[in-house]
């Protein structure tokens, strides 16, 4: 019997969500269909599956387009962060990704999660720094941060 998996199943007749697979009739009736792990692969259900896949692909494409637009916006702006300094322009502590995210939100009304910024040690000196940002699995951008004396 041909079934469409509605969720991931591990074990004898394993399959991933959305996968169409031929399984024994008893296994399908007594386990997969009974526990709602799968539905029978009727022409209507197959068509519905195709529509779901198409919709998911369009949503993913839209996410990528949004990330590319945000990358373009970030490349044209500069974030100014002020920090306390000592002699010779050395900062007391460092400028963290949290401070950069807050400044970006306050100055340009752009919200980016601090965990998406790749700045393991923070910024330790005055001046300009380019901070890489992972906007999407496929799209990376850069935030230009200007650290000034407070």
Swiss-Prot record:
GO terms for biological process: translation. PROSITE patterns: RIBOSOMAL_L9. The keyword RNA-binding applies. GO terms for cellular component: cytosolic large ribosomal subunit. Belongs to the bacterial ribosomal protein bL9 family. Binds to the 23S rRNA. This is Large ribosomal subunit protein bL9. It comes from Staphylococcus aureus (strain NCTC 8325 / PS 47).
């Amino acid at each position: 019997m041909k079934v469409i998996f509605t969720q991931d199943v591990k074990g004898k007749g394993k399959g991933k969500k959305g996968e169409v697979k031929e399984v024994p009739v008893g296994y399908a009736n007594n386990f997969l269909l009974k526990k709602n792990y799968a539905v029978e692969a009727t022409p209507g259900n197959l068509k519905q599956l195709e529509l779901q896949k198409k919709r998911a692909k369009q949503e993913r494409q839209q996410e990528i387009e949004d990330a590319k637009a945000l990358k373009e916006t970030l490349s044209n702006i500069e974030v100014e962060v002020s920090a306390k300094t000592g002699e010779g322009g050395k900062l007391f502590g460092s400028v963290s990704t949290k401070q950069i995210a807050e400044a970006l939100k306050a100055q340009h009304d752009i919200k980016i999660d601090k965990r998406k910024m790749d700045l393991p040690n923070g910024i330790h000196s005055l001046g300009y720094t380019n901070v890489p940002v992972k906007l999407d699995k496929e799209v990376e951008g850069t935030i230009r941060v200007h650290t000034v004396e407070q």
